[in-house]
Structure formats: structure tokens, C-alpha cells
């Protein structure tokens, strides 16, 4: 507070009828780094997640997650709660949508369960993919180490379908665009490893190179039906380093 241009910190300071009183508004809460805000409205938030950050808490990491960072930011603004709609692996960067109400969360999750959203990724993989485009199909299971892998016995696995097309070919590597038809956990990473083209930097799935010290997988496009009824599409270009790795 300022009285006649002078900062006053005491709450019991006397003020006369001719004094000029100014109240300083608190600075708005800064959006939490290293996230990037893509879109916000009364119904939802869309953010760009960096690699190395969990979407939600696990038993070993509860503090530094996208959900926690966004929740703290919303509370600092006097806002409402947020609700998780879907997730990205810690190693994957790119687009995530969060709901601002239970009703919106349920509506969006129903779209994901019905395979309605457009979910497109970009990945740099090891080796040269010869076919310009194609479909990755199969079944996935979780092994004893909790890693997702291709199932030999289709009766035990969950169906996984991914469309792909080649964006660029390099010496010993390929840049792919991958569109999810199903949305299984670890789907793209497991399917590309089974194909013999693990994602660059993905040591878990057999990559022998890690030039960027990250898994070269990025959620680049996310489209769905907004609660208003209109279809919306959000985009986040993949890191330029994917073309140089």
C-alpha cells in the first residue's frame, strides 16, 4: 500500500480524508517452467510437456510432475482444480490436455476410449525404414519388469494399431510421423522396437545411440471435440534436433 506515494507496511497506519491511497495488485502467477501453455479456456488446458517430466505422481516421484505444477499454478491464481485426461511417458515430450471439471474429464476420456481423438507423434528411429508408409499391428503385453512388449500369444495381449509415414530418411536413421489408432501405454515405443527400428535414445527398447540424451519421441498434434461442440486441433512442432540427431 502507498499513502501519498510513500510505501506503508503497517496495518494500523492512519489515513486522512485528503490522503491518496494506492493498493498494489499482486503480480500474476508465472506459468510453471519448463511447461509451455498452448491453450486455456473455461473448460480445459493444453500444455507442451518437456521430456524427463512425469504426467502424474508415482511411488518414487510425487512432487515434480505436470499435474502438480499445473495444480499449484491454478491454486496460485485462485482457480479451480484440474483433472488428468490422458498421459505421456516421462521420456516423451509434447501435447497434453487437462480438464477443469469432472464432467469435461469424463467427456474427453470417453472420446479417448472410443478412439476419436487425433493423436500424432514424430519420432526419429534407428535404421532406414524402406516403406514410405504403413500400418503397425499386433498385440502388447506387460512383462515381469512392467515393460510393454509385443505379445507372441495374441490371446494374452491387447490390440495395438499405429499408422506411420516417412518424413525424412538419413544415413542410418529415419524421421517418422506416427498416428495412433489405439492408445496403449508404450505402444509406439514397443511396436517400433519389434519392427527393428527402436526410437533413437530409447535404451529401454534397445536403442544403441543417445545423442540428445532423450528419447526422440514427441506428441506433435492433438485433436478432439471441444466441450463447446466444435472440433479443435493443437500442434507442437517436434524439436529441430530430431533432424540432426
PLM feature segments, named:
Residues 37, 125, 163-166, 199:
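Conserved hydrophobic positions within beta-strands
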Residues 1, 48, 90, 95, ...:
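Short glycine- and Lys/Arg-enriched binding-loop motifs that mark or flank ligand-binding interfaces
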Residues 47, 167-168:
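A short alpha-helix capping/helix-coil boundary motif
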Residues 86, 165, 179:
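Conserved beta-strand elements flanking the ATP-binding pocket of the protein kinase catalytic core
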Residues 1-149, 158, 216, 237-244:
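RNA pseudouridine synthases
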Residues 56-58, 109, 151-153, 168, ...:
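Short histidine-centered beta-strand/loop micro-motifs
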Residues 155-161, 168-171, 175, 181-245:
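Pseudouridine synthases involved in rRNA/tRNA modification
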Amino acid at each position: 500500500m502507498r499513502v501519498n506515494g510513500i510505501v506503508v507496511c503497517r496495518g494500523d497506519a492512519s489515513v486522512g480524508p485528503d490522503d491518496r491511497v494506492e493498493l498494489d495488485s499482486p503480480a500474476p502467477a508465472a506459468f510453471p517452467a519448463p511447461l509451455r501453455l498452448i491453450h486455456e479456456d473455461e473448460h480445459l488446458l493444453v500444455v507442451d510437456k518437456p521430456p524427463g517430466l512425469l504426467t502424474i505422481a508415482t511411488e518414487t516421484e510425487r512432487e515434480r510432475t505436470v499435474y502438480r505444477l499445473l495444480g499449484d499454478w491454478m491454486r496460485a491464481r485462485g482457480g479451480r482444480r484440474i483433472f488428468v485426461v490422458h498421459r505421456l511417458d516421462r521420456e516423451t515430450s509434447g501435447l497434453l490436455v487437462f480438464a477443469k471439471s469432472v464432467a469435461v474429464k469424463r467427456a474427453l476420456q470417453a472420446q479417448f476410449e472410443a478412439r476419436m481423438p487425433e493423436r500424432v507423434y514424430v519420432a526419429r528411429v534407428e535404421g532406414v525404414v524402406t516403406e514410405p508408409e504403413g500400418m503397425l499391428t499386433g498385440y502388447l503385453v506387460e512383462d515381469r519388469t512392467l515393460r510393454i512388449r509385443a505379445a507372441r500369444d495374441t490371446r494374452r495381449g491387447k490390440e495395438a494399431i499405429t499408422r506411420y509415414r516417412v518424413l525424412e530418411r538419413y544415413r542410418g536413421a529415419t524421421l517418422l510421423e506416427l498416428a495412433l489408432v489405439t492408445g496403449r501405454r508404450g505402444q509406439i515405443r514397443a511396436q517400433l522396437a519389434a519392427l527393428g527400428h527402436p526410437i533413437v535414445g530409447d535404451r529401454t527398447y534397445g536403442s544403441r545411440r543417445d545423442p540428445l540424451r532423450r528419447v526422440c519421441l514427441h506428441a506433435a498434434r492433438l485433436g478432439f471435440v471441444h466441450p463447446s461442440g466444435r472440433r479443435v486441433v493443437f500442434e507442437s512442432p517436434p524439436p529441430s534436433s530430431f533432424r540432426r540427431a
